[in-house]
Amino acid sequence: AMAICMSAIAPVLYTTKAKPFSYNKSNMNSEINKKIISIVKSTGITYIYGEDFWRMQLLNSIDAEVHSSELTDAYDKFVIPRTWLSRPSWYCINGEVLYYTKDGKADKIIESELKSKNGKILYNGAEGKIWLGPVIWSKPKWCN
């Protein structure tokens, strides 16, 4: 019964004026989204990570080559995979990946980690930054 009630909340909210998120406000052709597609195609690196479920998951819709997943902060010290509605295997990546940061708590941790590990800013604009760097989270047990 609880699951049914929880699954009904979002549709009910969208029929009222209390809309917690509006897809109409997301611009799939924004400058940063165009930059992400361009960087993915030029580097061949298709995995991109960052804070905020809505920011990251929507990127999966902009191009078939973009594989985006959310990272969240843990104890204000490091980031961990947020596997809710993400493909678990996307957190088992080796080598360099991309990061999309703005000004959130986890974004600040991501940027700090990338600076300490020689990450490179590939784009810095009003909508955020795109970084190239190593995997900065501890890989989950399911990756073994």
Segments (PLM) and residue ranges:
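Short periplasmic/luminal acceptor-recognition loop of GT-C membrane glycosyltransferases, typified by
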Residues: 42-76
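Signature aromatic-anchored transmembrane alpha helix within multi-pass, membrane-resident enzymes
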Residues: 1-16
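Surface-exposed cleft-lining segments at the edges of enzyme active sites
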Residues: 18-23
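A short, well-structured juxtamembrane/interface segment
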Residues: 24-41
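Short hydrophobic beta-strand segments
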Residues: 44-51, 93-103
